[in-house]
C-alpha cells in the first residue's frame, strides 16, 4: 500500500470537515514543566486532542473517508459490518448513519458497556461474539459473506487517509517537532502520521506505542516479521491487537523510528496526568503516547515532542478506579 500524498490528504480533509471541525492541539504548561523532581515532561510538548471529535476518538475521520469512497465505488451496498473494541465501531456507525446505511458491529464478550451503548445510539446492530478482537473480526467476515454486507476492516488505505488529516493538522499547526508519539492498535493512526510527515517533508521521528500486555506490533517491529502475541490489556482495550496487519507493518518498518512498550501502570499514570493537568478524560489507549513520553522524558531534554491523545472513551467505573489508584493493572506486582 502506498501512503497518501499531500493532495490526497487535502481531499480527505474536505470530506472529513463536512461532518466535523479540526481538533485542537495544545501545549499544556503542567504537562510541559518539571515542577519538582519526577514530575511531568520538562520539555515543550504538543497534545493532539482527538478525544474532541464527535465520536470521542480519531477513528471517526477514517470512517468518514471510507464511507464516502464506499458510496462512490459500491453504490449498491446497503449495509456494512465491522469488528471493534469500540472506537472503530463508533466511527463506522456514525458514518453509516450519515449515509443511510445499515451497520452491524461485532464486539467481543465483556466489551466496554459504555462503548457498546454509544454504538447502539448510532443505530447499529450490535453483535457480541468471541473472546477477543481477532475472534470478533473472524465472525464479522463470516457475517459479511452470509448477509451480503460490506466488511470495513480496521486497516485500509482510506482509513489511513482519514487519520492522516489529524496528523496534518498537528504537524502543520505547531513548530517543527523532533519526535511524535502515536499509539498503535491496528496501525491506521501511526501510518497516517507517517503519510502526513512525509507529505510535508519533515524529519520528525515517529515513535509507535503499544501496551506491554499487547506486544504484537513491538515484537513484529523488532524481528522484522509478523509476530502474533496475546492481547491481554485490562486498561487499554484499543491497543488489544493479537495479529498485526501486514500492510501496516510494512509501512511501520519503513517509516517509524521505534515502537516501544508501556506498562499498564504507566498508562494509568498518564490518564491521571491528563485529568489533573488538563482536565481531559483519556481512555487507556489514548493515554499511551503520553505514557511513552513520560517514560522517555530524560532523553527528550531539549527536544519538542508531539503526543497524540487518540481517544477519551473510557468507562466511568474504570476511570474512577484509575483516578483513585484502586485499579490493579496487569503486569504490576
Indicate where each model-derived feature is located.
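PLP-dependent amino-acid enzyme catalytic core
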Residues: 1-333
Amino acid at each position: 500500500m502506498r501512503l497518501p500524498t499531500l493532495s490526497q490528504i487535502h481531499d480527505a480533509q474536505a470530506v472529513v470537515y463536512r461532518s466535523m471541525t479540526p481538533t485542537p492541539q495544545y501545549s499544556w504548561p503542567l504537562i510541559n514543566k518539571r515542577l519538582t523532581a519526577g514530575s511531568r515532561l520538562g520539555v515543550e510538548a504538543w497534545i493532539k486532542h482527538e478525544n474532541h471529535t464527535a465520536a470521542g476518538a480519531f477513528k471517526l475521520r477514517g470512517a468518514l473517508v471510507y464511507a464516502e469512497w464506499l458510496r462512490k465505488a459500491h453504490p449498491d451496498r446497503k449495509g456494512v459490518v465491522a469488528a471493534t473494541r469500540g472506537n472503530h465501531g463508533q466511527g463506522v456507525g456514525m458514518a453509516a448513519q450519515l449515509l443511510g446505511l445499515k451497520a452491524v458491529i461485532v464486539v467481543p464478550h465483556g466489551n466496554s458497556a459504555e462503548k457498546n451503548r454509544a454504538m447502539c445510539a448510532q443505530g447499529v446492530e450490535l453483535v457480541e461474539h468471541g473472546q477477543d478482537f481477532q475472534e470478533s473480526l473472524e465472525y464479522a467476515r463470516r457475517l459479511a459473506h452470509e448477509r451480503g454486507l460490506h466488511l470495513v476492516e480496521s486497516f485500509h488505505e482510506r482509513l489511513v487517509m482519514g487519520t492522516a488529516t489529524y496528523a496534518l493538522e498537528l504537524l502543520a499547526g505547531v513548530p517543527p517537532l523532533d519526535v511524535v508519539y502515536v499509539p498503535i492498535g491496528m496501525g491506521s493512526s501511526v501510518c497516517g502520521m507517517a503519510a502526513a510527515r512525509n507529505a510535508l517533508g519533515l524529519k520528525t521521528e515517529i515513535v509507535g506505542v503499544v501496551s506491554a500486555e499487547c506486544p504484537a506490533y513491538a515484537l513484529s517491529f523488532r524481528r522484522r516479521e509478523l509476530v502474533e502475541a496475546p492481547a491481554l490489556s485490562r486498561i487499554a482495550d484499543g491497543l488489544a491487537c493479537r495479529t498485526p496487519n501486514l500492510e501496516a507493518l510494512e509501512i511501520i518498518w519503513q517509516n517509524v523510528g521505534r515502537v516501544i512498550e508501556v506498562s499498564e501502570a504507566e498508562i494509568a499514570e498518564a490518564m491521571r496526568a491528563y485529568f489533573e493537568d488538563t482536565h481531559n478524560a483519556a481512555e487507556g489507549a489514548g493515554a499511551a503516547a503520553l505514557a511513552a513520553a513520560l517514560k522517555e522524558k530524560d532523553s527528550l531534554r531539549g527536544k519538542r515532542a508531539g503526543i497524540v491523545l487518540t481517544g477519551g472513551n473510557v468507562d466511568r467505573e474504570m476511570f474512577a478506579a484509575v483516578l483513585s489508584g484502586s485499579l490493579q493493572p496487569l503486569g504490576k506486582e
